[in-house]
């Protein structure tokens, strides 16, 4: 039925070839002049899901993530072309380069999502998201990826909303 109205269905699963990059950033992501702060907040939420635990991220971990988010977007922000959009692996590599022990813990927690069996979100976006009707099909993500998938889809919807508002 969705396709009958010319909607686009994006299937996201470990075996799908449709990819959404959680690191995608729209320069109009925020109403103010600092889209990077909102994106950093999103990445903090993503890392909190990945790291788990009842206490969430420690203050030092949050600081390290925020620092790495600002570093990972430098190339893209200086020349905003799709080829320079970072992916999770870029964040992972930056975390591994940091001297803090907490950074190594975060990188280790991200490893399964970068190099392991759950790497479905370690790709550049390869689907067109500009259709007026987009359905994100995440039913095949599985228990380990479902919450992460929901968070990433929510961020993509927000990206689209900000694009629509700035048009």
Question: Model features per residue range: what roles?
Answer:
Residues 1-14:
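Glycine-rich phosphate-binding loop of nucleotide-binding enzymes
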Residues 14-22:
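Interdomain hinge/linker at the junction between the two RecA-like core domains of SF2 helicases
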